[in-house]
Amino acid sequence: METPLKPLQLSLELRGITKKFPGIVANDSVDFDLSEGEIHTILGENGAGKSTLMSMIAGLFPADEGEMRVFGEKVNFTNPRQAIEKSIGMVFQHFMLVKNHTVAENIILGQPGVVRLNLKEVHQQIREISERY
């Protein structure tokens, strides 16, 4: 007898997400669901609103309308730190690195709760993360 598949938990839900800039509607009532373990690609022409959508999800700026939920909890990110605390981050096409920092320091900069760097711990964390992936 086959065991029924357990429904995947929704990690991210977007409902009616809209973002407008002067003279432009970048995103118009976007609905999107992402379940645990899924991988999606957002495709579109230049200026289609892909980066705008991802920037709202990552907390870089708020939506003008709509609702976003992370694991069922309604969220209104006002900055990237809030998104990171919910395990949402964004890797930019063009890396924004701090030139005077080491690789380890650049990697750890976006981590929640980091006030002072213990480089020995940072190097260990990076080793552990790189072994997982």
Annotate each language-model stretch with its function.
Residues M1-Y133:
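Glycine-rich phosphate-binding loops of nucleotide-dependent enzymes
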